[in-house]
Amino acid sequence: MTEAKKSLKRTLIGKVVSDKRAKTVTVLVERRVKHELYGKIVAKTSKYHAHDEKGEYKLGDTIEITESRPISKTKNWVVTRLVEKAVLV
């Protein structure tokens, strides 16, 4: 019984769209779903507020967030890792 225990917490990958608040980033997560009636693949988006303790993630970064205990009224997610750094032009 040395199996790795699967986490029950959800993880999502999204792009940072705001980093203006202290210790908080706003993450835009896009998912693709099939329209029930017409069958077309449609992109749906959701915004989540995630806890960023050190303030290290910046606008445009792609990050992974994990569900956690409520941190504030709107914050129930914590930044887990950086997937891709934003490219500065």
Swiss-Prot record:
Annotated protein name in UniProt: Small ribosomal subunit protein uS17
Organism of provenance: Variovorax paradoxus (strain S110)
Pfam families for the chain: Ribosomal_S17
Family of this protein: Belongs to the universal ribosomal protein uS17 family.
UniProt keyword annotation of rRNA-binding present: yes
Gene3D superfamilies in the cross-refs: Nucleic acid-binding proteins
PANTHER family according to UniProt: 40S RIBOSOMAL PROTEIN S11 FAMILY MEMBER, SMALL RIBOSOMAL SUBUNIT PROTEIN US17M
NCBIfam families: PRK05610.1, uS17_bact
CDD domains: Ribosomal_uS17
Gene expressing this chain: rpsQ
Gene Ontology MF term list: rRNA binding; structural constituent of ribosome
A biological process term (GO) from this entry: translation
Protein origin, superkingdom: Bacteria
Entry keyword set: Ribonucleoprotein, Ribosomal protein, RNA-binding, rRNA-binding
CC per GO annotation: cytosolic small ribosomal subunit
Record's function text: One of the primary rRNA binding proteins, it binds specifically to the 5'-end of 16S ribosomal RNA.
UniProt subunit comment: Part of the 30S ribosomal subunit.
